[in-house]
Every structure is written in structure tokens, then in C-alpha cells.
């Protein structure tokens, strides 16, 4: 009978030992005490040290807006901006729209001419020759056949480059091209110095016979008034208003031959507008709220209960 009680007691002890748990007390510097249950006493320190990794918070000091942890660490409570703003704005961005048959107004030539007189019409803004139709890139075009050797042209040119699709050879104008700064046998050039006979130049200082100067100081209305260094034998009957001392001209003529007036048109138009209005007000208030600062725990002692 006693043996049975002994065996039963041993069994209960084994079961109790297997299921037994120890209680550990962890004390921290900030005053926190935590009780944890472990199966082995040696686990108390390990478990308490794991709690150190946890962060605790303390409220901010509203006067200094700082927090001082128990281990001496000081955290600042940053002011939280409160912004109230109302903004209304409407804006339209003007995108330019273009219309027109051509924006680069390149010239094509047609029509005979028998006597080399050049007439011009139309304004030229910078003294560079212009021809028919608005040209946005300064390429000139002229229009209309020329019957008595008078080449007619009209239209503004913004950059003063003139284009001609004809080259005059021995008094007859055939196909050719204009090159800037050089003249090929009675053709039209953008800038040249020399004499011309029955041709048009964008810029010249020399005598002309039946030709018109694209850039000359003064204005031309039938005759040339000033800025020309030599006489002209061909009558200039152009109507051209020149700003900055230059006149616009286009068209070329051939002496005892045929020259083609060039025709071409180009135009572009664009419009754009933008408007925007906005009103807003913002109020910024800096306050130190009673939030909490994070602090690190510091373990003081561990005890097994």
C-alpha cells in the first residue's frame, strides 16, 4: 500500500515538474516591472533582455517641447504645423493654332518678260526683299506673269531671304536657284556686291540696269532717292515702304529675253491666350502637442519568483 502511494507521488512529481513554470520579475529603470513565466530559470535573463528592445513612450513637456528619458536621453517634440488653405485657380493655356496653305512660302516662277524693268510693291521690315504671299520663314515668293519686262511682287518677308526659281542666261531666264552671297549670271541672290543687269538682289551697292535693290537706304516710290551709289538705267516703279532704310522688292527681269515671275503663297496664323486667377490663404500654427517621445528601456534587475 505504501509502495502504491510512493509510486503515485513520483508520477505526480514528474508530471508537475514537466508542466511547472517559473515566474520572473523584470525591473526597468523607468519604473516598469514586468512578470514573465518561463519553464527554466535560466531563461529569465534572456526574456528580460528581450523586453529592453521594446520602446516606451513618455509625454512631452509642453513648455520646453522636449522629452527626457530616464536614461538621460532627451528627445524633442517637433511642432506640428497646421495649415488651412483654400485655393481656387482657373487657367487656360493658349496653344497656337496655325492655318494657311504654306508656312515656308517657297517660290515657283512663270511668265515671260521682254524688257528688264523691275517693279516692287509691299513692305519690307528689315530691308530684305520680299515677294508675294506672307512668308513666315523669309522665303519670298512672287506672283503673276510679267508682260513688258516688269516683274511684280508683293508681300512681306520676315527674314529677308529671297528665293527665285530662275537663272538668267544671255537675256533669257531659265530654271535655277538662289544662293546666299553669290550671283549666277543674272539670277537673284540674297547678298551681293556687283553690278546687275535685269536682276534683283537682296543687298547690293553698285549700278543697276533694270533691276531693283533689296536693301538700300531710303525709300523707293518710282525713283530711288538715297543710299544708292550709282545710277539706275531701268525705271524703278515699285511702291515699297522700307523701315530701317530699306525697301522690299522681288521679281527678276531679263534683257531681251524672257524671265519668269515666281508665284507662291504661304501663310500661317496662330493665336494663343492664357489667363489664370487664384486666390489662397494659409494659416500656419505651430503648436507643441502632448504627444509622446520614444525612449529606450534599461534593465535594472531580474528576480525569479
From Swiss-Prot:
Q: Where in the cell is it found?
A: Secreted
Keywords for the protein's UniProt record, in alphabetical order: Glycoprotein, Secreted, Signal
Biased-composition ranges, Gly residues, are 257-279
Q: Which cellular component, as a GO term, is one annotated location?
A: extracellular region
Q: Which residues form the signal peptide?
A: 1-20
Q: Which residues are glycosylated?
A: 27, 71
Q: Where is this region: Disordered?
A: 80-281
Looking at the keywords, is Secreted present? yes
Q: State whether keyword Flavoprotein applies.
A: no
The residue ranges flagged as biased composition, category Low complexity, are 80-256
Query: What is the name of the protein in this document?
Result: Uncharacterized protein DDB_G0284671
> What lineage is this protein's organism placed in?
Eukaryota, Amoebozoa, Evosea, Eumycetozoa, Dictyostelia
Amino acid at each position: 500500500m505504501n509502495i502504491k502511494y510512493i509510486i503515485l507521488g513520483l508520477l505526480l512529481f514528474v508530471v508537475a515538474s514537466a508542466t511547472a513554470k517559473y515566474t520572473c520579475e523584470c525591473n526597468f529603470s523607468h519604473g516598469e516591472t514586468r512578470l514573465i513565466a518561463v519553464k527554466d530559470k535560466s531563461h529569465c535573463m534572456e526574456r528580460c533582455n528581450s523586453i529592453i528592445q521594446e520602446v516606451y513612450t513618455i509625454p512631452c513637456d509642453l513648455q520646453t517641447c522636449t522629452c527626457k528619458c530616464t536614461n538621460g536621453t532627451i528627445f524633442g517634440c517637433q511642432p506640428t504645423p497646421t495649415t488651412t488653405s483654400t485655393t481656387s485657380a482657373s487657367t487656360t493655356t493658349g496653344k497656337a493654332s496655325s492655318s494657311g496653305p504654306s508656312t515656308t512660302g517657297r517660290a515657283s516662277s512663270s511668265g515671260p518678260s521682254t524688257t528688264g524693268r523691275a517693279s516692287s510693291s509691299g513692305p519690307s521690315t528689315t530691308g530684305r526683299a520680299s515677294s508675294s504671299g506672307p512668308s513666315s520663314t523669309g522665303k519670298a515668293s512672287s506672283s503673276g506673269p510679267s508682260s513688258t519686262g516688269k516683274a511684280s511682287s508683293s508681300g512681306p518677308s520676315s527674314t529677308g531671304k529671297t528665293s527665285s526659281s530662275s537663272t538668267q542666261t544671255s537675256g533669257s531666264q531659265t530654271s535655277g536657284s538662289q544662293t546666299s552671297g553669290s550671283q549666277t549670271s543674272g539670277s537673284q541672290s540674297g547678298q551681293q556686291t556687283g553690278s546687275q543687269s535685269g536682276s534683283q538682289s537682296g543687298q547690293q551697292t553698285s549700278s543697276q540696269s533694270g533691276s531693283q535693290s533689296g536693301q538700300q537706304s531710303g525709300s523707293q516710290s518710282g525713283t530711288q532717292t538715297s543710299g544708292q551709289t550709282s545710277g539706275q538705267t531701268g525705271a524703278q516703279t515699285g511702291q515699297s515702304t522700307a523701315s530701317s532704310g530699306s525697301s522690299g522688292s522681288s521679281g527678276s527681269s531679263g534683257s531681251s529675253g524672257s524671265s519668269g515671275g515666281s508665284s507662291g503663297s504661304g501663310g500661317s496664323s496662330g493665336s494663343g491666350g492664357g489667363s489664370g486667377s487664384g486666390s489662397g490663404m494659409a494659416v500656419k500654427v505651430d503648436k507643441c502637442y502632448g504627444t509622446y517621445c520614444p525612449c529606450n528601456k534599461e534593465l535594472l534587475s531580474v528576480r525569479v519568483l
